[in-house]
Amino acid sequence: MRTRIVGLLLIAAFLLQFNSFARVGANTVETGGEAEPLATGIPAPEDVLGFVPGDDRKLASWSQVVNYFEQLAQASDRVKFETLGNSTIGKPFVMATISAPENLARLDDYRKIQELLADPRKLGLPGGRDRKAAELIRRGKAIVLITCGIHSTEVGSYLSSMLIAHRLASSNDPAIQSVLQNTIILLVPSLNPDGVDIVKDWYDKTLGTPYEGTDPPELYHKYTGHDNNRDWYAFTQVETQLTVAKIHNVWHPQIVHDIHQQGSTGSRLFLPPYMRPVEPNVPKQIVAGYTELGNFMAREMRGQGFKGITTNSTYDAWSPSRAYSHYHGGVRILSETASCKIATPITVKFDQLRKAEQGYDPKKESATFGPLWNGGEWHLRDITNYMTTAAFLLLRHASENREEWLNRFYAIGKEAVRPENPGLVNAFVIPPADNSARLLDALERGGVEIEFPGTFIINRRRYPQGAAVIRLAQPYGGFARALLKTQQYPDLRDSSGRPQQPYDVTAHTLSLLMGVPVAPIHAPLVLPKPRPEPGRGSNGGCGDAPGGRRAIYRSYSPSMDEGWTRWVLENQSWCLYHTPVTDSDLRKGDLHSSFDYFIIPDQSAATILNGYKAGTMPPEYTGGMGQAGVKALREFVEQGGTLVCLNRASTFAIEQFKLPVRDVVANVSEKEFFVPGSILRIELDTSNPIARGMPKEAIAWVEDSPVFEVIPGSADILSAMSAKRETADKMSALPAANVHIIARYPSDRNPLLSGWLLGESRIRGKAALVEVMIGKGRIILFGFRPQYRGQSLATYPLFFHAISARYSPPIH
C-alpha cells in the first residue's frame, strides 16, 4: 500500500510539473510544482481569450493575440508593445519588448551598447577597444529575440508566446526578476500573422468533422508557405524585411530562440547542437554558443523529467536561409517540439515511433537521444509545456551568463573586422550588370558595407563607374562571403555508401542565382575616395504585354513553388497578370477560351493527378485534377495553348501525354545520382525564342529534378497511341523532330557550380529544358526551377519567354 501511495505521489508531482502554466489563483502561477507570486492587475491570457493557451481544440485569432499583448502592456511596466509594420495582406506585425522597468526606460542606451560591440571599429583605435568594450559589457544586457509562429500549422509557439509574456510580466519570483534585470527580451508572437487566421479559420471550420486537424488546402503564407523560413538572405518577403530591418539590425541579439514544431512520430523535442556540416562562414564562437546553450537546455529538461529529447541530429547549420543570426553575431537556438493534429490531441503508440533519417532512433536511448518516451497521448498542452520550459531555461542561461554572452558577441565582431590574411580573398568587386542592383540590395539589407569608388583599377583591370566594392574585413563580411563564393558541400555518406540527405539544400551562392559576375580580390585594396552610391532604381508600375492570358495551376494540396511563381509574377516591376485555376476549375475544360498559357509549378506527378485521397479531406478538395483535368489540358494544347511545366511537374506531362522524352535519372539510386538543391551549369540554344537574349551559358537550380533525353523512334509509338484514343480531336504524331532542346548540361565538364552533385557523368550532354510541339500548341518542360524561391533571376528570362510570346521583361 505504501509503495502504491508513493507511486501515485510521484505521478501527481510529474503531472503538476507538466501543467506549468495552469493558473491557481489571482496572484499565483504554478511552475514545476510551486506557486509563484504574481503582481496584481496583470491580465492572464485566459482573461482575454476565454481559455488557457494550450487547451485542447482552442486557437486564438490574430486580433485576439494582438489584443492580449496590448492589454498586457497597458497593465505592466515590464512590457512595451509596438507595431513594426504590416504583413503581406495587411495585418499588424508586432513585437513585445520585455525587461525590468528601469531597463525599458533606457532602451536607447542599450541599443547603443549593442551597436558598439557589434562593430568594434566604432570604439576607436585597436589599442583601446578592449578596455572600452569591457566597460560596455559590464553595463550591457543580454539581448534575446524569441520568434514564434513562422510556420502557422505549428500553433504551439504563437500560443506559448502569451504564456511566456504573462509570466515575465507578472511573476515576482526571484529567478524571473533576475531574467528581467539581466536581459532584454524581444518577443515576436508570430513571424507570419496572416497564417494564424488561415489556420484557425480552417481548423474551426473542420472542428467536429472527420477532417478535424488537417492542414488548410492553401498556403499559410500568401506566397511562400513553409518557405517563409528560407528567406533570411534574399529578403524577398515583407515579414523577413521587417524582422531584419527593425529587430535584428537594430538590436543585434546575442541569442535568437526560434520556436517550431516537427512531426509527431519522432523525438518530443530537438535542441542544438546541430548535426554536421556547419557552413564555413559561421564563426567558431557561434558554434560554441549554440552547443553550450542547447546542451544546457536539454540537460536541465531531462533533469526535470521531460522525455524524448534529441540533440545533434536532423537539423544542420549549413544555410543562411534559415539562420540570419549566425552571420550577425547571435546564436540561433532552434527548438522543434513534436506536433499533435493542430490543436487536436493524438495517441502515438511506441511501435509507431519512426527512426530519424539522421542521428537517432526514438525507440533507443543514445548519445543524441533520451530518455525514452514510451508513447501515449500527446496534447497541445504537452507542446506548450515543452516550449515554455525550454524558453525559460534559455532565458535563465542568458541571465546567469550575461557577461559571457556579451564577451562572445564582442569577440565575433572583433575577429570580423580584423584584416584578412595575405593571399586570401579580402574583397569582392561587383561590376554594374543586369540584376547587380538586386544583389547589392540583398547584401545591404544584411548589413553589408558597400563602397562605390567611381572608376578604379585593380589587378590591371579597369572597373567602371557604378562598380561596387565589398571588403570582407567588416562586421558582416562573412555574410557577404557566404553569398558571393561557391559552396562545396562535403560528401557525407552512411555506412552503406548512401549520401546523407541535407536538411534543406546545399547551395546559396546568390550571385550565381542572379547571374551577376563577381570578382574576388586577393591583393590589398587602395581605392579612390568613395563616391555617392548610384541610384538603383525601384519597382515601377504594373505593366504587361500582349498575350497575357495566363493561368497558374493551384492544387488543393498546396505547392510552395506555386506561391513563389505568383510572387515572381506579381511583385516585380513587370507584374505579369495571371489567374489561379484550381482542380475543380480545370476539370470543367474549355481552357483555351480564357488562356494562352497554363503554368504547372513544381509538384510531384502523383499529387498533381490524384491530390488528396478520398476521406482525408472534404470531398471538394480531393482527387487532384484527375483524368478530366488531363483531358482539358490536352485539348488546350492541341488547340494552340502553351503548357509550361516546372521541375517535377514535367514528369506529370511526360507520363500523361506520353511525350517522346524520358527522365534518365528517374529510377537511379541516390548512390549513383544525387543533387539535393544545387546550382548547375547549362548551355543554351540561343536561336530558340525562349532563350533569346540570353548568354550561351547559364545556371539552373536543380533539386529533385528530371533530366531529359529524347526517345529514339518515338513517332511510331505516339502514332499508335493516338489511333487508340477515342476523342473528337486526334493527337498528331510527335516525331523526334518536333522536340526542341533549348538547354542541356555540358558534355565536356562537370556541371556543378555550387553545392553537391554525385554521378555527374549521368547528365553530361543531357537536356534540361525542352519544347514539345503538339497539334497547334506546345509543352515546355523545365528540368529545373527557373524562379527558385524568388532568387534565380538569372533564369527568369527563360520562364518569362515561355509564358509571353513577345515579352522581354526589364530585369536590370
Q: Which role does the model predict for each range below?
A:
Residues R23-I184, T224, R230-D231, T236-V238, ...:
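Intrinsic-disorder/low-complexity accessory segments
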